[in-house]
A protein has these predicted regions:
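Cytosolic, long alpha-helical scaffolding segments
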Residues: 1-145
Length: 145
C-alpha cells in the first residue's frame, strides 16, 4: 500500500474515532439529563473501545512513519493526526466522567441541571465535527470558523 492510501485509511479511522467520541458526548449529557443509568453504562463501556482505537491509530501513524519516511508536509500532517488522536481519546474520557455523574443525579432527584448543559453538548459536538472535517479535508477556512 502506498503513502496516500495509508493516509486515507488513517483519515477514515480518525473519522470513526471522532464519530464514536461525538456519540459518547451526546449520550453522556443525555444520560445525566434524563438520569438514565443504562445509557451512562453504555457510555462508560464504550470508553474502552475509544481507548483501543486511539492505540491502534497511534500504531498506524508510527508504522507509516517507519515505512515511508514522509516528506515535510506529510510528516506535519501525521504529527497533527497523532495530536488529534490523543485529544479525541481525552475528550472520550471526559464523556465517561460526565456519564459517571448520572448515579449522583439519580440519588439527588431534587437537583436540576442548567439548561446551558444541553446546549453545551450540542456546541461541543458541532465544534468537534467541524474541526475533524477541516483537518481531514485540509480546509483552512473551515478550521478558522
Amino acid at each position: 500500500m502506498n503513502l496516500p492510501s495509508r493516509i486515507q485509511d488513517l483519515n477514515y479511522n480518525l473519522l470513526k474515532l471522532s464519530s464514536l467520541v461525538e456519540t459518547n458526548i451526546k449520550d453522556a449529557f443525555s444520560a445525566v439529563e434524563k438520569k438514565d443509568l443504562e445509557l451512562s453504562k453504555t457510555v462508560i463501556n464504550t470508553d474502552s473501545k475509544i481507548n483501543m482505537m486511539e492505540v491502534e491509530i497511534e500504531k498506524e501513524v508510527n508504522d507509516i512513519l517507519e515505512t515511508f519516511r514522509p516528506s515535510d508536509n506529510d510528516l506535519r500532517y501525521l504529527l497533527a493526526a497523532l495530536k488529534i488522536n490523543n485529544e479525541l481519546e481525552r475528550i472520550g474520557d471526559y464523556a465517561t466522567n460526565i456519564a459517571r455523574n448520572t448515579q449522583f443525579m439519580v440519588e439527588h432527584p431534587d437537583l436540576e441541571l442548567p439548561d446551558v448543559l444541553a446546549h453545551s453538548a450540542e456546541t461541543l459536538t458541532s465544534m468537534l465535527n467541524k474541526a475533524i472535517n477541516a483537518f481531514i479535508l485540509s480546509n483552512e477556512q473551515t478550521a478558522l470558523d
